[in-house]
Each structure stands twice: as C-alpha cells, then as structure tokens.
Amino acid sequence: MLRALRGEAAPSPQNPLFLSAVAASSPVMEEIIYKVVFQATYQTLKPLLAFLHHDSFLYWPFILSTLLIAMLAWRFTRARGDLDPAKPHWKEFFDRYLSRRLWWHASSHLDYRFYFINAILFPLIVGPLLFSSQGVATALGNLFGMPEAQSAAPSFWDALAYTVIFFIAYDFGRFVSHSLLHDIPWLWQFHKVHHSAEVLTPMTAFRAHPVDLAVMAWVPALTTGIVTWCFYRYVNAGIGMITFLGLHAILWIFNLAGNLRHWHVWLSYGPTLNRWLISPAHHQLHHSYEPRHLGCNRGFELAVWDRLYGTLYVPPQAPETFRMGLGDGSDGQWRTVWQLYVWPFLMLWRRPPAETKTPQSAGDQ
C-alpha cells in the first residue's frame, strides 16, 4: 500500500526482498525464531533457577545440607575449644561464616556477577564444542561395534558395578583435567581466574573461565565414555546407572557437603579418611598460596589420585591458617568480569606459553 502511494512497484516473486519476506513468514523460520528466543530466555533465567536443578551445587537440598553440616562442623569446633566461648553460639556462627565481611567482599561480588554472565555465555560460546560420555560411547560403538539391545534387563549388580566404575572414571577424569590446568603453563593462565578469588563462598565454585570449564568437561567425558561403551559392549546394552532424583547416586552423597569446599567452614575427615577421600578442608588448602600448599589436593572426591601423583596434603583436624589468592602481585588484574574473561588471553599474548610459569614452577610465587 505504501509503495503504491509512493508510486513504487510492488516486489515481484523474483525480487530478493519478496523471497526474504516469504521466508521470514514461513513455518520453518517461525520455528527457528521461536527456538532462538526460547533458548535466549532460558539461558537468561537458568542461573536464577539453579536451586531447582539437581546438577547444580545450588540445588536446594544441597544448600540445606550445606547449612546443616556447617552448623555441625561449627559445633564440633566449639566443643574442641577452638572458638571464643564468651561469644553467644549464634553470633559466633554468624561472624565466622555469614558475615558481610565474607559475603559482601569485593571478590564475592565479582563471583556473583561472573556467575550470571558466564551461565548465559558459556552454553552459547563453548557449548557447541562440548561432547558427552554418551557421545564418546556412541563413537566407540561405531568404530568397534555395539551389540543389539538385549531382551533381558540388566541385573541390580550390573547396574551397581556400572554406577561405581562410572564414578571412579568420572573422578579420575576430573583429577586429570585439574592437573592439566595446573601443570600446563598456558592452561594455568585460564585456571588463574578461579584461584584469583580472595575469599571463598559456594559461588566461588562457578568462578571459572570458559576455557577452564571446557577442559574440565572434555576429559571426564572421555573417561566415562570409555566405561559406558565397555558396559554396553560386554555387559548389557540397556544398562543404566543407579540415580537418586535424577543424579548419580554416589555423586549425590558427595554433593551434600560439596558447597563446603568453597566456604570457610573447616571440615576435615580425620587422619584415616583424609588419605582416601577429599574433604572440604583439602580443597580450601588447594586455594592457598602458601609454599607448602602450592598445587596440592587436586582431586574432587577421591584422594587416591593425589596420593599416586604426589600432590596430597592431608589437612589437620584443627583449622590451618593460610592465605588465599594468587600471591603473585596480580590481584589488581582480576577485579572485573571483563578482566576475568580477557586477561588470560592478554597474558598469553604478552608472554609465550613457554615463558609462562605454573604455581609449581620456581619463581612464580
């Protein structure tokens, strides 16, 4: 109509403008636009709904269990006489674990901002580059063969064996990933983002560069994918893991105290268990830049990998004093979300990987 009033010819079916208009109104384009809008909305809201996702440390049962275990650990510390008996119990707990000094620290504020932005950008930028253990198992099946699905259902013992071995492979994969981030100089530049935290809260767990997150996803996908293919190939193609509310049953148990790894609640499992399991105290010491702690305790659930690799530092029962951060004088370089994303690339640009040192290298600290 407007074209006619202006004396312009209407676009013909051969006109690119006409074709683009038709394409834009087609069902296929409508579906694509709907998916894009839906994904953008979902990724924007997902960080706010993490307390409903069982695969997040912010899942509400894990938050409740964290608070409960923190209170029990605090009571045990008081019973040992390590705290000030003159203070009321509730005030001591609040001052130690819930104070503004901790949760409103500049480093904590940066954790909060980085969490929301990273949760939106990571699936869009790095997500297409990721692969799953199921994808690895399928690829191995295409290469080496995959049996037809058996009519007989897998037994409970088969499922239990798969659940346990999958967990071991997953934990080993995460240890290998974490060690690569510490030992390979150019990867350490990206892992510095996580270690630049000056205080620890459960949100610090999400303070990780997308490159860091990709490495932490790739290796466990390989180790668990191999295990999955082996069970499909040699046990039962219909086998599945034992889960609880949609999450691997063993990981569920460990996640009950998982948030304490990044919180100033000292929970050590004792001299015997500490040699087999990674306690929250193990990982808190991992964030220390004291010379005796550098590069220690890289595992997540099992301490056996650190023992074999020579990086296990067994935490004492009483809280140990240490300083956190990078300790290399670069604190001012990790103050904004932009710096957390860009600074690792700038460091690699300014200093070739061969000249970049990891925390275990002489002269880095």
Regions found by a protein language model. Give the residues of each.
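Membrane-interface segments at the starts/ends of alpha-helical transmembrane spans
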Residues: 37-57, 105-108, 149-157
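Specific transmembrane helices
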Residues: 57-146, 162-174
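Membrane-embedded catalytic scaffold of the fatty acid hydroxylase/desaturase
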Residues: 117-129, 141, 148-322
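Short, charged cytosolic
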Residues: 30-36, 80-97, 179-195
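Short, strongly hydrophobic alpha-helical membrane anchors
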Residues: 16-52
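Short, low-complexity, charge-dense intrinsically disordered segments
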Residues: 2-13, 23-24
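A membrane-cytosol interface segment of integral membrane proteins
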Residues: 319-365
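Membrane-interacting alpha-helical segments
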Residues: 34-49, 113, 117, 257, ...
